[in-house]
Amino acid sequence: MKVITTVKDMQQIAGELRASGKEIGFVPTMGYLHEGHATLLRQAKKENDIVILSVFVNPLQFGPDEDFDRYPRDIKRDERVAKEAGVDYLFYPSVDEMYPAEQTTKIEVVKRTNVLCGKRRPVHFAGVATVLMKLFHITMPTRAYFGMKDAQQVAVVEGIVSDFHIPVTIVPVEIVREADGLAKSSRNVYLSEQERKEAPHLYRSLCIAKQKIEEGERHPRNITTVVKEYIEANTNGIVDYVDIYAYPALTPLEIIKGRIILAIAVQFKNARLIDNITLTVQ
C-alpha cells in the first residue's frame, strides 16, 4: 500500500491506472476507520482492480459549533485497517493541500438536504458535495462506496453524480452493526458507559417500526410516534428527529408506500447518533 499526500501525485497515478484499463474502487472517509469502513473497502476490493481510500477530515462540512477539532483521528490505525482490507493507495492530504486558497466555487445542493440531518446542519451538504466533487476528479474512480448509515448523504451523492454526469457508479453498502445492533460509527467512542448501554435501543425502535409496517400500519405519524416514545422511555438521549420519507427523493409521505426511509437522530451528552432502515412497501 502506498500513502499519497499530494493532489498532483494522486491524480497522476489515478489517470495512469485508468488509461491502462484498470477499474478503480474509491472509498472516501474522514478516517478513524472501523468495521463499517472495512466492509466498504473489502467490497471495493472484490469489485475492482485497484482500491483507493481517502482519509480527510473535511472542514467545509462542519458548522461553527460542531466537532471538527474534536473529531477522532488516528492515521496509524487507519493505515493498519487499510492494509488489512487490501487497499492499494491511501490518499491522505492536508487541509492546505485540498484547499490551498480561498474557494472561488462551492456546490450548493438544492434538493434532499432540507430534511433529516441537513435541516440542522445548513452548511454540511454543501461541504460534502464540494469535497466529493474534488475527490472524484482527483481519484477518477469507476465505483465509489458509501455506507447506508448516512442514507441522506448517499441520496445527495447520487443526485450530484446524476446532475453533473460524473462517470462513477455509486455503490451503497448496508449498515454494519455491533452484536447488539448499534450502528458502527467513529463517534461511538464519545458515549459514556451508560449511554453505550442505551444506544442499541435506537435500532430496536426501528425494528419495532418495521414490524408495525409489515403488520399493515401505513400512517407515518403513527409509526414515528411509536419510535419516539420507545426511545424516550428507554434512553436518556434527546430525540432530534424521527421521520419517514420517500427514498431517495426524501420527500414527505401521506401514506407509507414504495421505497421509504425511516430515519432517527438522538443527541446524547457528547455524541449525536443517527440510524435508519430503508424498506420497500407495497
Curated annotation (Swiss-Prot):
GO molecular function, one term: pantoate-beta-alanine ligase activity
EC class of the enzyme, as a word: ligase
Keywords tagged on the record: ATP-binding, Cytoplasm, Ligase, Nucleotide-binding, Pantothenate biosynthesis
Pfam hit, one: Pantoate_ligase
Domain of life: Bacteria
Catalytic function, reaction form: (R)-pantoate + beta-alanine + ATP = (R)-pantothenate + AMP + diphosphate + H(+)
Subcellular location: Cytoplasm
Keyword Aminoacyl-tRNA synthetase found: no
Active site location: 37 (proton donor)
Residues bound to ATP: 30-37, 147-150, 176, 184-187
Pathways involved: Cofactor biosynthesis; (R)-pantothenate biosynthesis; (R)-pantothenate from (R)-pantoate and beta-alanine: step 1/1
Main localization of the protein described in the UniProt heading: cytoplasm
A GO cellular component annotation in the UniProt record: cytosol
Family annotation (InterPro entries): Cyt_trans-like, Pantoate_ligase, Pantoate_ligase_C, Rossmann-like_a/b/a_fold
Binding site for (R)-pantoate: 61, 153
EC code: 6.3.2.1
An individual GO BP term: pantothenate biosynthetic process
NCBIfam families named in the record: cyt_tran_rel, panC
Function, in words: Catalyzes the condensation of pantoate with beta-alanine in an ATP-dependent reaction via a pantoyl-adenylate intermediate.
Oligomeric form and interacting partners: Homodimer.
Comment field (misc): The reaction proceeds by a bi uni uni bi ping pong mechanism.
Family to which the UniProt record says this protein belongs: Belongs to the pantothenate synthetase family.
Name of this chain's protein: Pantothenate synthetase
Lineage, highest ranks first: Bacteria, Bacillati, Bacillota, Bacilli, Bacillales
Name of the gene this protein is made from: panC
